[in-house]
Amino acid sequence: MNTNSLSRLWIMMRREVWESPFSFKWTPVIVVGFILLFTILALIIGARVDNEMVFTKDGIRQFAEMAVEQRSLLLYGVTISISAIFTQVMFVVVVFYLAGCLYDDRRDRSILFWKSLPISDTMTVASKILTAIVLAPLVYLAGTILIQILIMLIATCYSFLAGVNPFTTFWGPSNLPSMWLLLLFGGLVQGLWLLPLYAWILFCSSWAPRLPILIAVLVPVLIGIFQQFWSFFSDFRFSTENIMLTILERIGRGVVPATIEWDQITDGSERLTRPAEEMFMSYGSVVDSLFSLQMWIGIAIGIVFIVASIWFRKRATDS
């Protein structure tokens, strides 16, 4: 792929964002607003209960007296939890975006206009799947960074009231720039992890006569139910290798930016021995996930669905 093709692909990805402003622009803003609103409401309620903020100030002072490692761990957990909210909202948004992106072109016949342009169907489908696994994580990461900075500014104001240094208490231990780079890397890897699910939904959008999201959900559900019935009536036991369990496991690992590495932080009794930031996410866990067999099997399945989507896209106007 030459530079001209990459430039055209980038323009088409930006077009996807421009045509879906609620999904990729307003939804992150709304999530930021809700988190900020609930944070402010919690502080207001706390101020009404805690007259003159005696307990609040004492709590901040006690937090400042903790070891740096403890403060770093607590702040890391809070910021990762915030990013998890954005990741989960993004997953829902991307699912509905992919379910409608090719189907809507066929429904309103705008596909005729796009096919009249010097843009291949391969490029069109690629722009949509790349928007889901690359551009969407970048947009929602921007929302994550914004709300984290706003909450840290609120914490800074409270630390001044408590008479502690906000930079050594909050900003330093939080190590935000390093965490943002990790979230960026992890978000892109999670996008690849979810590629088979995203590609399946895109595939349904390319051929479904109506309600592609319903078809995308019902087909694996029915297969999973059939698997359970078949295994039960043939072996009188429920199957452990169920397609629905596999999908739910992949979704669970793809929408939560956290990986608890028990082999690194626990002893043989599963008792927490060395709690650290690796409880939530680390470069090691992300790299291990990237080069795992499950990841590459999923990518191969996703490529098959993408190729099938291109095939149906090319024949969408034949009838």
Regions found by a protein language model. Give the residues of each.
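Hydrophobic core positions of alpha-helical segments in small-molecule transporters
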Residues: W26, S127, A216-V219, L293
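Hydrophobic alpha-helical segments of integral membrane proteins
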Residues: L9, M13-S20, S110, I129, ...
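Helix-loop-helix units of permease transmembrane domains in multi-pass membrane transporters
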Residues: C101-T131, R313
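Secretory targeting signals
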Residues: T39, L43, Q62, Q70-F96, ...
